[in-house]
Amino acid sequence: MAIAALSNFTVPLASDQSSATQGLLMPKLQYRFRISFEGLGGSKGQNTVELTKQVTEAARPTLEYEDQTIDIYNSRIHYAGKYKWSPITIKLRDDVNGYVSKLIGLQNQRQFDFYEQSSAASAGEYKFTMRVEMLDGGNGAHSPNVLETWECLGCYIQKTTYGSLAYKNNEVVTIELSIVFDNAVQTGTTAGLGIQGTDQTRGGTKTTGG
């Protein structure tokens, strides 16, 4: 009886909208995530797994459409203009072996040669891919399941903050990155954005994504 009562821990719904025995679905948790990088630092870059280990804070993508307005008699009509992805902030611990600092330095050097004062011929020479994965909490002998994956494509580091220092503080030294990217898609079984599918519109069935 006590176990059955757990199904009541949710919003009341009609029986034709939700199963009477289904309670609240388990939400994803903020601390169960993994950030990985592909191509950051270029051919001279070390193993980017060290970056993944040292991430302390991150974020998922933020998508925004530019609101456009058509003024008409006595009113206005709104429609979605071009979209934009907001930069993602990644905070990492700065390890004593210098792996994190070196990789970030190599990536910034790819974007602009600070010694020769020379820039890359094209953006494709320095852009990389970043993945934001939500995990289910598994570890060790129980491999984690990936609940959601965001692939951020065409990334570059817009801003690098090497962090403050203070004699009175015991906290670890961090490096904060602001990463700009061209596009983002969701992958995996729970993906909804950027995948191939069909959608019913007033004009009929259309294929999306792919």
Which residues does each predicted region cover?
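Glycine-rich, low-complexity intrinsically disordered segments
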Residues: M1-G210
